[in-house]
């Protein structure tokens, strides 16, 4: 069974929320690409649309929006996602994943693109408060 940790950022308030998703809701994310806007109703966020901004696999390898496919590749990078050069002109070969979400991913980063009627605090904080 596929499980994802979704880090959802609310750009209005500056807060981020962690969601653990499995089963059918996680299956709805497979095949989507980094940079696409999806409906968040399968995640329990009715009326919301989220934009997938990034992801990382079980080894911590980040995905790049500009790399098609789902596999891991060794790229010679001069900056951007996956490498932060310390000097001008510095390059390094780094492992990077493609932009397609697969079952190998563990964490998916997203931000709210369209807001629903209820606030994220109401939708996401209520189950955690009831469990305590």
UniProtKB/Swiss-Prot annotation:
Show the taxonomic lineage.
Archaea, Methanobacteriati, Methanobacteriota, Stenosarchaea group, Methanomicrobia
Assigned protein family: Belongs to the eukaryotic ribosomal protein eS6 family.
A Gene Ontology annotation in the biological process aspect, one of them, is: translation
Q: Which Pfam families match?
A: Ribosomal_S6e
Q: Which UniProt keywords apply?
A: Ribonucleoprotein, Ribosomal protein
Q: What is this protein called?
A: Small ribosomal subunit protein eS6
What domain of life does the native source organism fall in? Archaea
Presence of the UniProt keyword Ligase in the record: no
Q: Which InterPro entries did the record assign?
A: Ribosomal_eS6, Ribosomal_eS6_arc
GO CC term (a single one): ribonucleoprotein complex
Provide a Gene Ontology MF annotation, just one: structural constituent of ribosome
Gene behind the chain: rps6e
